[in-house]
Amino acid sequence: YNGATWSGSGWTGQPLMMKWPKKVKKAMNMYDWAKEKDDLVEVIYACMDGYVYFLDLETGEATRDTLNLGFTFKGSGALDPRGYPILYVGAGYDSNQGTARVFVVNLLDCSVMYTFGNNDPFSLRGALSYFDSSPLVDADTDTLIYPGENGILYLIRLNTQYDQEAGTLSINPDHIVKWHYYGNRTSVASYWLGMEDSAAVYGGYLFVTDNGGNLMCLDLNTLQLVWAQDTLDDSNSTPVLSIEDDHLYLYVSTSFRLGWRSSSSAEVPIWKIDAQNGRIIWKTSYECYSDDGVSGGVQSTIALGKKKLSDYIYVTVAKTGAQYDGVLACLDKKTGEVKWEHKAYYAWSSPVCVYNSDGSGKVLYCSCGGKAYLLDGKSGKLLDENEISSGAIEASPAIYNNYMVVGTRDCRICGLKLE
């Protein structure tokens, strides 16, 4: 559309997975065999061809007809955390059906219950209305929390009515609250308003980065900005929350958009931030390159180690060392010291930690060179690699038990079994 071609699964492009209760499946438009399969885990994947795909995690077989929404979906969307059969997914580009928007989909029959965000006069970016973020739902208040690249944070009370026994579902959105902001260095040419990452929320406070190089803490009850920290550049990395010694910290990074800070290369820090006041605890930096339209730095979300990996964080850094090179870096949470690096083709994909029953862990990530890598989380030793695509893998993998699923730019959805 409009001279742009979008193929396969893009950034962030993480599939969603759900093991629906049998009573819920009974009311769904699934194929009969899928309804009857007791251990079915359904993969729900919105892709850049405008379709949402529904697949059996174990086999890749379609569990129901594809849903054609007619817009490019780069982001991952979200399922309702209450177990309600609702999909929230935002379009990442306009189409011949109009400007991009958010869809709220009833997964009982795949009907669209509600759309919003397109041509919003409250936007400070005109008609631009892209949504790459994954939203959150506050169960206590039945409120959808959705950041947009149009610079608006949407808070929408859904008034959800779901009767599992009857197999009925409806929403009646009202009390729609919108928040937007101005950036001191924002212009038409650079440091744009807008949020492409996803928000993190803790105790009534929302943390989000933006295209304008800001990490913001917002009080959701007053919609007052508590603090802002300079992240230097177009930031697409979702802040990751970590409680350490009864104190809340954030791990986050940024990218390098060519021409904003430099026409060649620029520093890309990885930060540990005090969530209470925005103070920088430590930073570890990489020098990164960019192509026009293909940014280096950190496009991914940092993986927080748990269990026997609880001392570490893992982050993919793109276009460092050389234009097409990158690293998966393991950093010490307390100091920011680099413990090890795995060097390969650069990656936009977020790493995922997986654990054995004894608490030992491995790290899995995918590269824009088409490979998936599995490494020991402590030593960084390469345990396995698999070239699963002849094109790039920009999307982030999702893992359920010992199955991994990821989409590729060459129009494949791949399932791998981890052993």
Go through each PLM region and give its residues.
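Extracytoplasmic/lumenal domain signature
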Residues: 1-11, 16-89, 93-131, 136-419
